[in-house]
Design a protein with these regions (language model features):
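Amphipathic alpha-helical dimerization/coiled-coil segments
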Residues: 71-100, 106
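Hydrophobic, amphipathic alpha-helical faces that serve as interaction scaffolds
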Residues: 66-80, 112-150, 188-189
Length: 201
């Protein structure tokens, strides 16, 4: 619910209402919301209670700056270690099988599967842990703004290019492609945010 785009940014999560909706005890709801607050997905304020986090342009840039640093370092470890990433290959194969009607959530899930596979292949516990800490906020960006993900063929082609670069083993080319890929994603997300703010102004 938090990451599927059904809640508007800033929506209040009233304990009584959501406990009933989800069929869980209120203390379970409180424990779950605290976990999501710690992950940056929810925020608690004195007057408004628990709300879905609202990301601004600075948040997006900050999240993707950390994401880029982690993924580029993971790429270095993968290429210099000559590691194989079958899960990334599988994600690209699934991308290739998508039609134009694929849901944004399907595209986002494959996108994250690809990038998560790269992180996992680096075989670094600390990179993995750091990436896990920001992954929920990456997904929140995508859920709230959703640009680009309605063009599955374009997203598939980008990830195919990234995979081919990794397999070719040219570190500089691959790093540059990943930086461009994530830089374009940051720009798409911030543009979508600006467009949304203009509509609601």
């Amino acid at each position: 619910m938090v990451l599927d785009g059904t809640l508007e940014p800033g929506s209040r999560l009233r304990e009584t209402d959501f406990s009933k909706r989800l069929g869980i005890a209120r203390h379970t709801f409180r424990a779950a919301t605290q976990i999501l607050i710690n992950e940056g997905l929810l925020r608690r304020s004195p007057n408004r209670g628990v709300q879905l986090a609202v990301l601004d342009g600075d948040d997006i840039v900050d999240i993707f700056r950390l994401r880029e640093a982690l993924e580029v370092e993971a790429i270095r470890l993968v290429i210099t270690g000559k590691k194989e990433i079958p899960e990334a290959e599988e994600a690209v194969e699934q991308f290739n099988a998508l039609d134009d009607e694929a849901s944004w959530r399907t595209v986002v899930d494959l996108d994250m599967s690809f990038h998560r596979a790269v992180i996992d292949a680096a075989d670094s516990e600390r990179i993995n842990r750091a990436y896990a800490g920001v992954q929920s906020e990456i997904l929140l960006c995508m859920a709230q703004l959703r640009p680009h993900y309605d063009r599955p063929a374009e997203v598939a082609a980008e990830h195919r290019e990234l995979l081919e670069a990794i397999e070719a083993g040219d570190l500089k080319v691959t790093e540059d492609l990943f930086r461009k890929h994530l830089g374009d994603a940051t720009e798409n997300l911030t543009n979508a945010l600006e467009a949304r703010e203009e509509v609601t102004a």
